[in-house]
């Protein structure tokens, strides 16, 4: 540990050092746990509560965090400040107790903003791609020896963490637009990857409200700050005339300041040329498939180039980039002989994408990189509201796979909506396309159903943001077969 740098951090805001114990309600979530871990390493006493034990809570307990697995008023008695997840109800007994005791209650984003306030903040926002872009940018800064603090929404495989405390001056963070909480942040540099209708329940169902919120976010930049924005995105192009900050664009668009061309993909390996204004052209090589990941990489390159990071560090970091957990995550290759007695091998991949645009990008990536494979998708829709709002879009995109198995909608805390369910979605796809989806209501039937239909050279894509991640892991460790040969992760 860099004790000298830690001492410097502790002197930045002496008033905050008066805070001894910080309590997190819902500490088991990825976003909450990352910030808790950073504050723990900064020297604060951290406690938390959650209803479920998981890998995250076990890791925090091993680091010395005190976690109670029930929400009771006693948990907050000695806290100086309480940090709450957006998933926590205001009726939570710990919140009620904190209010009675006049203990300050803040959101996760407010605490992240406090961490960013005395660092060089770089915030990555957008409907799609922000987690991967954050990880790519963090990897470049690590390669360059800049030792950044990192707060991400996905596990970065190369460091095995969602978040880390660095002793350099940079804080690289994923900015969450889902509940407008990113408006608390005041970064020096911002990336906006794209803007699309999602989480509309938090925007009163008004897309203009969503657009204007992103406009407010970009104007959180100081006058000397920089906004990095994707010119391929039509909503971003529409917003550009209304922005009064320094903007640098990127994309396949011929007018972009950082322009991709000559894109090639073979399996997971991607290469392309990158033209940069007043800078040498770069040949980029990635092991993250898809045009969407090429765009994510260019967003990171644009920031790194503007910040003066050497090209060799950029190229090396991106080539070595191992990806994000649950983002086109190759879990292994499996012999069919032990699954259904047939000859051949199938490949199992997990992907977190749950918006139809994300599904479309992943399907396109498979078609380009593995053109000879039959694409078998197991999809778990995420949220009733998203399924309702994007129903026709889902129908069109899901119709493009070769075989579709669909699980029940993962509610993510939502109540069911009449007429919005996976069985109806399957019926609509069946009636409007050549595809005959298979609806699976009972999860224990999934391995049997897969075994019946799998063929040599299939690519099985476990798609979704809910419990399907656990299902994919179970399949990979032996529920689908007992003797597994793992390939290196992509």
Swiss-Prot record:
<keyword id="KW-0067">ATP-binding</keyword>
<keyword id="KW-0133">Cell shape</keyword>
<dbReference type="InterPro" id="IPR005758">
    <property type="entry name" value="UDP-N-AcMur_Ala_ligase_MurC"/>
</dbReference>
<protein>
    <recommendedName>
        <fullName>UDP-N-acetylmuramate--L-alanine ligase</fullName>
        <ecNumber>6.3.2.8</ecNumber>
    </recommendedName>
</protein>
<dbReference type="GO" id="GO:0005737">
    <property type="term" value="C:cytoplasm"/>
</dbReference>
<dbReference type="Pfam" id="PF02875">
    <property type="entry name" value="Mur_ligase_C"/>
</dbReference>
<comment type="pathway">
    <text>Cell wall biogenesis; peptidoglycan biosynthesis.</text>
</comment>
<keyword id="KW-0961">Cell wall biogenesis/degradation</keyword>
<keyword id="KW-0547">Nucleotide-binding</keyword>
<dbReference type="InterPro" id="IPR036565">
    <property type="entry name" value="Mur-like_cat_sf"/>
</dbReference>
<dbReference type="Pfam" id="PF01225">
    <property type="entry name" value="Mur_ligase"/>
</dbReference>
<keyword id="KW-0131">Cell cycle</keyword>
<feature type="binding site">
    <location>
        <begin position="126"/>
        <end position="132"/>
    </location>
    <ligand>
        <name>ATP</name>
    </ligand>
</feature>
<dbReference type="Pfam" id="PF08245">
    <property type="entry name" value="Mur_ligase_M"/>
</dbReference>
<keyword id="KW-0963">Cytoplasm</keyword>
<dbReference type="InterPro" id="IPR004101">
    <property type="entry name" value="Mur_ligase_C"/>
</dbReference>
<keyword id="KW-0573">Peptidoglycan synthesis</keyword>
<dbReference type="GO" id="GO:0071555">
    <property type="term" value="P:cell wall organization"/>
</dbReference>
<keyword id="KW-0436">Ligase</keyword>
<dbReference type="GO" id="GO:0008763">
    <property type="term" value="F:UDP-N-acetylmuramate-L-alanine ligase activity"/>
</dbReference>
<dbReference type="InterPro" id="IPR050061">
    <property type="entry name" value="MurCDEF_pg_biosynth"/>
</dbReference>
<dbReference type="GO" id="GO:0005524">
    <property type="term" value="F:ATP binding"/>
</dbReference>
<comment type="similarity">
    <text>Belongs to the MurCDEF family.</text>
</comment>
<comment type="function">
    <text>Cell wall formation.</text>
</comment>
<keyword id="KW-0132">Cell division</keyword>
<dbReference type="GO" id="GO:0008360">
    <property type="term" value="P:regulation of cell shape"/>
</dbReference>
<dbReference type="GO" id="GO:0009252">
    <property type="term" value="P:peptidoglycan biosynthetic process"/>
</dbReference>
<dbReference type="GO" id="GO:0051301">
    <property type="term" value="P:cell division"/>
</dbReference>
<dbReference type="InterPro" id="IPR036615">
    <property type="entry name" value="Mur_ligase_C_dom_sf"/>
</dbReference>
<dbReference type="InterPro" id="IPR000713">
    <property type="entry name" value="Mur_ligase_N"/>
</dbReference>
<dbReference type="InterPro" id="IPR013221">
    <property type="entry name" value="Mur_ligase_cen"/>
</dbReference>
């Amino acid at each position: 540990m860099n004790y000298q740098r830690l001492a410097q951090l502790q002197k930045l805001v002496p008033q905050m050092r008066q805070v001894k114990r910080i309590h997190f309600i819902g500490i088991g979530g990825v976003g909450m746990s990352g910030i808790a871990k950073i504050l723990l390493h900064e020297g604060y006493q951290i406690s938390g509560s959650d209803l479920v034990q998981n890998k995250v809570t076990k890791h925090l307990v091993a680091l010395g965090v005190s976690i109670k697995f029930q929400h009771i008023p006693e948990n907050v008695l000695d806290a100086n400040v309480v940090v709450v997840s957006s998933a926590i109800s205001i009726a939570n007994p710990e919140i009620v107790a904190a209010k009675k005791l006049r203990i300050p209650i803040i959101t996760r984003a407010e605490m992240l903003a406090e961490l960013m306030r005395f660092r060089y903040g770089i915030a990555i926002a957008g409907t799609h791609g922000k987690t991967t872009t954050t990880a790519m940018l963090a990897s470049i800064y690590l390669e360059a020896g800049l030792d950044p603090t990192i707060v991400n929404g996905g596990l970065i495989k190369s460091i095995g963490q969602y978040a880390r405390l660095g002793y350099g001056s940079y804080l690289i963070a994923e900015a969450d637009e889902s509940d407008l909480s990113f408006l608390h942040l005041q970064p020096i540099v911002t990336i906006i990857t794209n803007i699309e209708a999602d989480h509309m329940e938090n925007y009163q169902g008004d897309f203009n409200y969503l657009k204007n919120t992103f406009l407010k976010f970009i104007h959180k930049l100081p006058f000397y700050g920089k906004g990095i924005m994707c010119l391929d995105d039509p909503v971003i192009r529409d917003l550009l005339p209304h922005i009064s900050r320094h903007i640098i664009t990127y994309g396949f668009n011929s007018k972009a300041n950082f322009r991709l061309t000559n894109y090639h993909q073979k399996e997971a390996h991607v290469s392309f040329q990158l033209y940069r204004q007043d800078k040498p052209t770069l040949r980029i090589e990635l092991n993250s498939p898809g045009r969407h990941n090429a765009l994510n990489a260019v967003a990171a390159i644009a920031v790194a180039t503007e910040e003066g990071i050497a090209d060799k560090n950029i190229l090396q970091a991106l080539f070595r980039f191992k990806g994000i957990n649950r983002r086109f995550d190759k879990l292994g290759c499996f012999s069919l002989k032990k699954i259904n007695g047939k000859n051949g091998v199938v490949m199992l991949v997990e992907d977190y994408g749950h918006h139809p645009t994300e599904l479309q990008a992943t399907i396109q990536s498979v078609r380009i990189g593995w053109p000879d494979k039959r694409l078998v998708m197991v999809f778990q829709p995420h949220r009733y509201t998203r399924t309702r709002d994007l129903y026709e879009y889902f129908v069109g995109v899901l119709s493009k796979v070769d075989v579709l198995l669909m699980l029940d909608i993962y509610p993510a805390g939502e109540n069911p909506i009449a007429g919005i369910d996976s069985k109806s979605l399957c019926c609509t796809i069946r009636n409007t396309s050549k595809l005959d989806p298979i609806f699976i209501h009972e999860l224990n039937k999934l391995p049997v159903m897969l075994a019946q239909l799998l063929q040599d050279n299939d690519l099985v894509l476990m798609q979704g943001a809910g419990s399907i991640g656990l299902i994919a892991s179970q399949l990979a460790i032996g529920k689908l077969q007992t003797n597994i040969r793992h390939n290196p992760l992509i």
